[in-house]
Amino acid sequence: MRVPFSWLKAYVPELESPEVLEERLAGLGFETDRIERVFPIPRGVVFARVLEAHPIPGTRLKRLVLDAGQAVEVVSGAENARKGIGVALALPGTELPGLGQKVGERVIQGVRSFGMALSPRELGVGEYGGGLLEFPEDALPPGTPLAEAWPEEVVLDLEVTPNRPDALGLLGLARDLHALGYALVEPEAALKAEALPLPFALKVEDPEGAPHFTLGYAFGLRVAPSPLWMQRALFAAGMRPINNVVDVTNYVMLERAQPMHAFDLRFIGEGILVRRARPGERLRTLDGVERTLHPEDLVIAGWRGEESFPLGLAGVMGGAESEVREDTEAIALEVACFDPVSIRKTARRHGLRTEASHRFERGVDPLGQVPAQRRALSLLQALAGARVAEALLEAGSPKPPEAIPFRPEYANRLLGTSYPEAEQIAILKRLGCRVEGQGPAYRVTPPSHRLDLRLEEDLVEEVARIQGYETIPLALPAFFPAPDNRGVEAPYRKERRLRELLSGLGFQEVYTYSFMDPEDARRFRLDPPRLLLLNPLAPEKAALRTHLFPGLVRVLKENLDLDRPERALLFEVGRVFREREETHLAGLLFGEGVGLPWAKERLSGYFLLKGYLEALFARLGLAFRVEAQVFPFLHPGVSGRVLVEGEEVGFLGALHPEIAQELELPPVHLFELRLPLPDKPLAFQDPSRHPAAFRDLAVVVPAPTPYGEVEALVREAAGPYLESLVLFDLYQGPPLPEGHKSLAFHLRFRHPKRTLRDEEVEEAVSRVAEALRARGFGLRGLDTP
């Protein structure tokens, strides 16, 4: 958020300097990313009035006759160049920061141009370069250096935390500074309203989407450029001035963190209707884009008789049809409180994030709509000559904040401080809280704009924040004999061991939020989450997660959107929340498998990830196998359950292709295991010094037979001297019988104390062959072609 120092100083006149302000805001919890000096306007730029504007035949240029203290002519190609406006004129010899060159006197299309009429970009005050910077024609005496009325500004770029939506308005920051002891000058709403009937009606069909909605009426407007002070403030805050009516709505939004919108009264019909969009409805928004509306979009509509038509996306952006124009004379002024979840979903659906939607998504003061109406209408009176109706149309009854018990003694105990009771109460009052009762227990009602104050601990935190965290005394913790935590620490040691082993195998650890989007339960074909948050930070963090793997998939998706890594190996150890809280380990593999020429392309990643798990469990000394099983979120032909020491602990497989397609992801393989893993005492065994004996075996089995079943059979029959078993070939096709496949294994035998004799190895292989035949399997080359 951009905070112009001079604008904030209008509310807090005692502010010493931008540097002191940065320090004060840091103590209040608002980090400054940078301090920027803007508007270095050269002395050679003066204010000028456009007396005449004549098109130059055969071109899109105009010859302007200006009064800049003396009559001068310039050539301009700006569409908005016209008689009766004020402009910024760069005289010959002026070096412009927005151009990086000096302005000269030139002949253009046979007209001598004495300088240059400037756009905001050319003047260096804004990014917009499509037209002249417009001022009221009487803003300054002609020829006055613009820098005298538009001095250099210092802007602080702040990080505002999600729990403080009120601080997205300068008045919210000013109130916090007031709590530090600075005097606060609240902006006045000197409104001269008239007792007039309103020429429109208000209907709200969706009170959940718009719990509080107000409409004001202003007429007799003179739409014109805003005065210099307002344009300077808006440019400094990062917004482009449009005209005095639209600029007032943006100015009050930046002041109070309360977005608002003005509708040209000629285009709303009989009144304003707040409803959900109809299927197939279309709306051209102010950015010129024709949008097809979604039935869940909350819209502001007008109506005539039985016909209703959309005027804007509620809380996001207005429609082009009802925007304020040069000839607008009357407006309906919307100031509302919308459901944050609804606004966020609409903004995301349409890829349309605006200053208004940003504030509505965080939440606005539920009681702030009427004061914002009065403030905006008073500015319209002052700047646009508006007449204002005293009455407001209002729908909804916002709920005032509830009182919170507060005990100063508890605050000191919680913080480890000894702040005086009177000082704590004074801080809460300076923050705008209403304090009732007597000590030791008070009842504190927070101001309606502080949506984050709900608990006694919130008030304690406010006391510490305003007093300054540096005033909390440092104290060494008390030292006690260390308890015997071996039983408690064991799971953490095992988790640390897992992390070390996976990192050694090339995996990268990630940390994701413990929250999930309830919509992900549908997207990933999971059971609905059991635990929903009452006050989530965002809709996509509204439930406690039930699995880890969706978070890993999201991490991969975000990285693929930014870059295109060839390969990714990710893992996470974290808590999930089902019938009870559990710790899980999840991993993800993305990218082509290597060293697996025998595997089908869709299986190579699966076998590679399975190999990583085999290596992991071999290092842990645990028996591991995978048995085929279908999971709704995994590829039905590439999935299985994971068994460790015979106990089912999780799953392994490829993400279901339909889910991958919905997320626009390439093939992804993943696993998730429940921790802690089954225990098995580790016994050290000397590496054998004796040579190994090798045999290859090709087993022919029906195609649906799971690999794990064959592997388990071979291991059991081979006896105690089988050291390792590796699948090195998978084949289907002639000359094998139809519906069969061949699995070829490397078998390695070794005795720990001596060299194995050939007859011992052959006996073990014979036992394997007999066990396979007894199960109905054959040996390739002996029992089958």
Curated annotation (Swiss-Prot):
Residues binding Mg(2+): D452, D458, E461, E462
Protein's name according to its UniProt entry: Phenylalanine--tRNA ligase beta subunit
Domain spans labelled FDX-ACB: 688-780
Key word Hydrolase present: no
UniProt keywords, alphabetically: Aminoacyl-tRNA synthetase, ATP-binding, Cytoplasm, Ligase, Magnesium, Metal-binding, Nucleotide-binding, Protein biosynthesis, RNA-binding, tRNA-binding
GO biological process: phenylalanyl-tRNA aminoacylation
One protein family per Pfam: tRNA_synthFbeta
Cofactor annotation remark: Binds 2 magnesium ions per tetramer.
Primary subcellular site in the record, as a coarse category: cytoplasm
Domain B5 positions: 399-474
InterPro entries linked to this entry: aa-tRNA-synth_II/BPL/LPL (IPR045864), B3/B4_tRNA-bd (IPR005146), DNA-bd_dom_put_sf (IPR009061), Fdx_antiC-bd (IPR005121), Fdx_antiC-bd_sf (IPR036690), NA-bd_OB-fold (IPR012340), Phe-tRNA-ligase_IIc_bsu (IPR045060), Phe-tRNA-ligase_IIc_bsu_bact (IPR004532)
Subcellular location, record wording: Cytoplasm
PANTHER family (UniProt xref): PHENYLALANINE--TRNA LIGASE BETA SUBUNIT (PTHR10947:SF0), PHENYLALANYL-TRNA SYNTHETASE BETA CHAIN AND LEUCINE-RICH REPEAT-CONTAINING PROTEIN 47 (PTHR10947)
Similarity-based family: Belongs to the phenylalanyl-tRNA synthetase beta subunit family. Type 1 subfamily.
Quaternary data: Tetramer of two alpha and two beta subunits.
Domain tRNA-binding: 39-147
Gene designation: pheT
Cofactor: Mg(2+)
GO molecular function, one term: magnesium ion binding
GO cellular component: phenylalanine-tRNA ligase complex
Top EC category: ligase
